[in-house]
């Protein structure tokens, strides 16, 4: 399902700053300068600023991670039918990749259910709405994440929660059937065993 997110508010002309979006940011490491220089003309200025000022780490109470795109770009291109026009920006606590697409849209590639959504147009709008309750309800599974953390503990930077067995292979979407796994390896596993996200 493709859905563009928009809601009127009397403050809609005001943009939330990157600092507000990442106010609970936990830094893991600096983004390598060579990565910034390699991609700075291909991605939104807001993302470059995040790379420069915050680096690699987690935000939204650990649900989202700022990633090194070099770690995910080839996998995204191989496993996603829009991979040629998509750029990996973040990953979620359940192994979804949040993308910048066609130099215009923020999308989410959901390997667990082999689906995608175009979340919103413009990076500044994503920044404005990412902590909005309705936006999170539409695109993230915060309640399940909180239950998973309560049962299995907080995730390390390189981890996500993986369903065992995979949802695409008949697994159950609950905390009793998940474990902590390495994010990149788990996305590769979902792609290899269940297939990627393709336009079929």
Which functions belong to the PLM regions below?
Residues 109-141:
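Compact, glycine/acidic-enriched structural inserts
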Residues 68-72, 110, 127, 144-147:
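Short, surface-exposed, charged/polar-biased interaction segments
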